Amino acid sequence: MPPRRKRVSSAPRRRRRTYRRTTAHKHQERPVHRRRRRRH
């Protein structure tokens, strides 16, 4: 049984960086993100 990684600590930090830094790249890959950003 491999040790479980703690994603709770990294999740919030990675989400904020991805949204701001890879905005263009994100909506190019998944259009869903673009719709969510517009509603936000």
Swiss-Prot record:
Question: Record's superkingdom?
Answer: Eukaryota
An annotated Gene Ontology molecular function: DNA binding
Region described as Disordered: spans on this chain = 1-40
Q: Membrane-spanning regions, if any? A: none
Tell me one GO biological process term.
spermatogenesis
Q: What are the entry keywords?
A: Chromosome, Developmental protein, Differentiation, DNA condensation, DNA-binding, Nucleosome core, Nucleus, Spermatogenesis
Cellular location of this protein? Answer: Nucleus; Chromosome
User: Which GO cellular component terms, listed alphabetically, does the Swiss-Prot or TrEMBL entry include?
Assistant: nucleosome; nucleus
- This protein's record includes keyword DNA-binding: yes
Q: In which tissues is it expressed?
A: Testis.
What biological function has been recorded for the protein in this entry?
Protamines substitute for histones in the chromatin of sperm during the haploid phase of spermatogenesis. They compact sperm DNA into a highly condensed, stable and inactive complex.
Q: From the Swiss-Prot or TrEMBL record, give the protein name.
A: Protamine-2
